[in-house]
């Protein structure tokens, strides 16, 4: 009998998007992919799955040491909420449904914030069409944007511009934050 830790789902030092810090040799994945873990998709037979006692996650310290180890921000950002999805997988049985899990996960934001955990929020959705830039979030986070490196300001609605590359959006809620993203054609993120 064994405990499993497939890297493409549970190595929390892996990048969460192509433009964020972290390793990428096992996979690039966020909380949604962690939650989507399935034994059959990973090549386990039913007989092999029957011998699994549980799942576990890992964060390899060489990456942490390269990011100011005096503060937990980077470790928190890389680990949470992926660790929440891992816990759900390890302790809950039955059919998993992302929308329901994400609804419950958002309830944990206040708890993680109260504990001082610097968790990662899902990135804002940004689009640019016909000279109009829009951004949205799926939670109660505050959406902000700096224009070309200026002080961030609250996003209150669509922005008319011919220069979408000057706008990057980030959401924050308590001690959580999202990566900073732009319109897909100009997409990039900053380091956490």
Stretch-by-stretch model annotation:
Residues 1-132, 138:
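Flexible, acidic glycine-rich loops studded with aromatic residues
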């Amino acid at each position: 009998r064994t405990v499993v830790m497939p890297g493409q789902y549970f190595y929390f030092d892996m990048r969460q998007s192509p433009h964020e810090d972290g390793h990428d040799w096992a996979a690039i994945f966020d909380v949604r992919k962690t939650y989507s873990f399935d034994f059959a998709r990973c090549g386990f037979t039913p007989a092999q799955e029957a011998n699994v006692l549980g799942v576990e996650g890992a964060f390899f310290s060489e990456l942490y040491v390269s990011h100011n180890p005096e503060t937990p921000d980077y470790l928190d950002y890389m680990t949470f909420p992926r660790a929440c999805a891992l816990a759900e997988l390890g302790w809950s049985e039955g059919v998993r449904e992302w929308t329901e899990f994400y609804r419950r996960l958002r309830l944990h934001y206040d708890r993680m914030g109260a504990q001082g955990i610097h968790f990662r929020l899902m990135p804002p959705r940004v689009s640019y069409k016909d000279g109009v830039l829009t951004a949205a979030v799926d939670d109660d986070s505050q959406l902000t944007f700096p224009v070309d490196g200026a002080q961030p300001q609250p996003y209150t609605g669509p922005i008319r511009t011919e220069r979408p590359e000057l706008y990057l959006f980030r959401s924050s809620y308590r001690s959580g934050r999202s990566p900073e993203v732009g319109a897909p054609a100009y997409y990039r993120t900053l380091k956490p």
